Amino acid sequence: MKESPLITLVKRHSETHFANIKYGYYVLIISLVYLIGLALLRAFGRRTPSRSSSAFKNKIIYRLYDIDPAIHLGILFFAVLVPFYYHYSLTTQSTVYLKRLGRLSYALIPLNLFLTLRPNWFLRKNCTYTDFIPFHKWFSRIITVIGLLHGIFFIIKWAIDDNVSLKQKLILKTFNFVGFIISILVLFLLICSIGPMRRYNYRLFYIVHNLVNVAFILLTPIHSRPGVKFPFLLLNCTLLFIHIINRIVFAKSLMILNKNANYSKTNLVHVRLPRAILPDYFEPGSHIRISPYRRINPLYWLLPSHPYTIASLAEDNSIDLIIKETSTAEPGSQIESLRSNPKSFHLDQEKNYTLINSYPPSVPEECYSQGTNIAIICGGSGISFALPLFRHFFNKENVKYLKMIWLIKNYSEYELVLDYLKTNGLTFEKKLSNNKRISVFISGEYTAETRLDEITTNIDDENSEYEMGSFNNEDEDLSISNFNSENADSNDNTPETSHSPTKENGSLIEVKSKHSFTLSNELKSFNNESAQVNQNETWLFSCGPPSLLQLSKKYCNDERINFSVRLTDYEGKRKE
């Protein structure tokens, strides 16, 4: 009898082929747990600096509440990396860990997409999307670096293995070649995201950022073995779809009603929009995002929109913006340069725009309802955030102390805001008291003819800081050092002045020129009042360049005072 030949069956996949599937699910579960923890933190967490705790403990508590990237990313990646090295040998089964890097990068994308939703209905009550901008910036970079390392390590592994053809592995195998293309795209994105490159041409970065993200989401399932179509591709595509729907459903056509500008003296301008573009109620300090393109235009989706803080209150008859326009002009040619400068964005009456949506400020709800001892300090275009807050608290009967400090470079900026108040019939005299006041500090000469030699940055887009957190803005040269008497612009014939130059609000607004500025001196009454009221009733708001925000944060940490800060380029001259 003839024996039948021996048939040997070879497994299509090695025993480690499916080793990372459970790890991908684990990362997804950690992402969900992080979101739940974040929602609980913002709903029940304490951001108030305790007067009985140490300054270090208060700082950690605030950074945790404020979604500081260093702390939150540290917690998140500690959780996802704890089981990263498990069971398999790093020397003999290194492929498992190289594949695990790739799955980790893709499994983290749903969390990143979810946190950047505008609006985010799950976290809307206690968070705004602006709270996540620093986190998103660093989280995105880490995800792309992990994905890039996955590709680089595989190329190195194949290159040093004499038993493997690099060409056959990398080029001839379709799914590996797709991965190689993804790596090239990710590398290009990382190059474009480097600070100098991003600031030089933010629009290029923004286009590359969006296109590479979409390519990464759609091409990775073709490359991945085993597949990631469910649940990761499904989740990512669903979240992308929600992003698209948000930019369609909430968008409205927009026309500029009026624009008040005097480029020969200042690049601070007042823009008026129709009241009907916003809902009946919006919080003081809210902002809008505007695109110069219609929704059917591909550039609406490819290029960034521009955020502007609303200087009005919900009860006003119009929506007003007080913004700084980027200028690279030489003296005497402001208008021409502003209009022709390709690296700037300006709102003009003769053009149509699209309002993408309105967004609440990153201000806790209890501040509006419980605040009775309020200080607001702002610089330059930060007045657009400070003024509606001042008006809101000014109209409240239970407010015991209210002071707004505005630091500017020349008197023309004050004139423009004064004109805005007059045009809208905004006077404060009927409810005026000794504990409610506005102080305006001018670093230059106190004269209506003073002309500011603007120090500007060649900015590609008014949006770059707001999107990615690079600190370049029109108010950055408004340094606190300019308000020290020895550093202020000096003129031997111009004495220090302190005036209340308006008839309507003369006893409310005090304008000071060439006075040295010390925050602790200006807020003595505020600090004294804070010791007599509940800690939740005392708040300091600050909006301006980084030097001003750092000064405000230090003051609040030292005095154990609640604070909310915002960078000026959020305000509108946005390159936020």
Swiss-Prot record:
Residues 101-219 form the Ferric oxidoreductase domain. It is a multi-pass membrane protein. Residues 480-507 are annotated as: Disordered. One of its GO terms (biological process) is reductive iron assimilation. The chain crosses the membrane at residues 21-41, 70-90, 101-118, 142-162, 177-197, 204-224, 230-250. Pfam families: FAD_binding_8, Ferric_reduct, NAD_binding_6. Keywords: Electron transport, FAD, Flavoprotein, Ion transport, Membrane, NADP, Oxidoreductase, Transmembrane, Transmembrane helix, Transport. It comes from the Eukaryota. This is Probable metalloreductase AIM14. It comes from Saccharomyces cerevisiae (strain Lalvin EC1118 / Prise de mousse).
